[in-house]
Amino acid sequence: MPEFIIGARGHDFGRQTPEALFSAIGQAGFRCTQLAFPKAIEGVKSYADVTPSLVEAARAASKASNVGIAVDGTYVELSYADEEKRKAEVAKVLSQIPVAKALGAGCM
């Protein structure tokens, strides 16, 4: 039977650099996190700000702190009645699929 792992939402630790964020989560005793870049990483205002170098910094910080990324937190509204708004939200989700894969996050 798999070990039970306790995690925390990254943004409950405030907006920080990936290194500081993962360090704080690990020091608080958690082994995994939900990482929502726009809510938890300083300087990220939208998913467009999530660059490959930032994803790599988060991946490296996760590894260094031994805090896994269980969830790539992608906060979107997929039920807009307005088709253009809905399509914009779908595009956000699609842009984060490769990010989730790179981070090893099994859930979005």
What does each of the following model-derived ranges do?
Residues 1-107:
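N-terminal pre-domain/capping segments
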